[in-house]
Amino acid sequence: VKPLPPATPPAPISEDIWIRKYRFGSEAGIDDTWRRVAKAVAAAEPQDQALWAERFHGLLADYRFLPGGRILANAGTARNATLLNCFVMGALDDSIEGLFHALRESAITLQAGGGIGLDFSPIRPAGAAAVRTGNIASGPVSFMHLWDAMCETMTADRARRGAMMGVLRCDHPDIEAFIDAKVEPGALARFNLSVLVTDDLIRAVDGDDDWPLVFAGKTVRILKARILWERILRAAYETGEPGILFIDRINRENNLGYAETLHACNPCGEVPLPPYGACDLGSINLTRFISQPFTPEAACDFDAIAETARLGVRFLDNVLDVSHYPLEAQADQARKGRRVGLGITGLADALIMQGLAYDSNEGREFAARVLGTMRNAAYEASVQLAEEKGSFPLFNADAFLDRPFTHRLPEYLRDEIRRKGIRNSHLLAIAPTGSISLLGGNVSAGIEPVFAATVSRRVRRLSGDYDTIGMDDYAFRLWHEGGGEGLPPGFVTAGELSPDAHLAMQATAQGFVDNAISKTINADADMPFEAFANVYRTACDLGLKGCTVYRQGSRGEDVLTPVTEGAWCTSDTC
């Protein structure tokens, strides 16, 4: 493998993130953190643990691979905290005992550091009679407020606030109350909301058909599908939520569709999970693989990406074995399927470093080549791990290879899986990578475009107050450190891109990802509602698993604010 280019010195925000989120005890510098994490994860190896610790340290120390935040914060600390970023909780039981048992399990999981996802569809609608008591039910949204208050209480004193995803089926009788649940500012502040949209709803919208709202097999009332669809999109337009999950497509594309049905996902949407499923995440930092940036000779080392992907899969597989699990059911579920989510970050910056525009055919071709390389390397590594350590317990070769995603794998990989098995049911997911991208020098997050050359970022302190920190984008800073002026060739920001350009990149990436993708499509504040609504329909037509569109200013004060041209800042004091 070719030597990697030297890393530019970390941005000021990087040290701030390390101190607030990932530093443990008396660690003097980030290399102490890397060594702690590498040693802890290598402990899963049956032999040669010191050797694997060194290999994992090399993976981390030059920022090639950035593990999920819970891994960085908790591995090797002896804290009773999980290394897994998020979980989907068990299926809710529509009884007072069942709901408060689920609330308790959610509290235990949040206390251990995990975000959670919940499907509230099993809860009877408001106004229905309870079976045993005859009391009138208050509906799922009322119970969501209970979860929200619990989450606020459990995580109020932490730099990392509790995160929850709440979902509801599009045919639940309380779907309209769910859609409007965050219209009031500050309501359900700990939740992201998404509607589980079925193929039947899309067909009914197309046919301008009636849409029955159903609970326990009984139709409660009927409305026009088109009116419901527009109400979902109008709420998203006005408030930024709910997002949409195309749940039938998620289940069709699930590698374990022969053994489970998915109803929910993690809070950021990149990993649909079964009840008690867990997110085990890490991202390859693409900026570390671009040599001679901003020159005609700029190139990407795809062989090094493949090698990093192979080692990253082993790292994440080990995490499943060394992690603490808040609940035994979570440990059981994680080890049945051994899902991991290897992703990327820094895509937009890697494009800029090569002079490629995010919205160009060449930019999408680069993303496809990167993710195709990663997919093949990750599946190869998982087959090799199966030879060493065994396949995941739910593996059935015929059923696994009959799934849509595995059908699209190269034939040599399908043959290898049939002959040798595979260690992990899922291998790829693209997370938002907010904090770890800041740790890596403020590289562009996940597959998102660069938000702006320089931004002012609101950062929450433990006190609950917010500071404002100025930050340069990684590629922009690298360009200026090399003597460049203005903006580098190929530099384009999220706000300058059309929604179609965002969607095209997400669709390109989704074809290579067996889990899902966390992606926000940015829209101008003055975008007409009709154009906004078309984005969601295009997302459906392109085969995406989910869609979130954020219209600037629709959630009040934005976390990121661009600094206008002429006020760029490249100093370390900004």
Give the ranges of each region predicted by the language model.
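Acidic/polar, glycine-rich intrinsically disordered N-terminal extensions of enzymes
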Residues: V1-L83, G90, G207, W229-L233, ...
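Internal maturation/activation junctions in enzymes
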Residues: A216-K218, T308-A331, R335, R339, ...
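A structural-propensity feature for long, helix-poor, extended segments
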Residues: P125-M164, S291-H324, Y379-E380, E388, ...
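Active-site cavity-forming subdomains of large catalytic enzyme subunits
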Residues: K2-P9, L84-F302, Y325-A329, A378, ...
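Core structural elements
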Residues: P10, H57-G76, C170, L311-V322, ...
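Catalytic alpha/beta core of large soluble enzyme barrels
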Residues: E270-P272, L316-D321, R403-H407, E416-R423, ...
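Terminal amphipathic helices with adjacent charged low-complexity linkers/tails
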Residues: P10, S14, D180, L196-V197, ...
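Gly/Pro-rich turn-and-neighbor structural signature
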Residues: V41-R79, L83-M89, E97, E176, ...
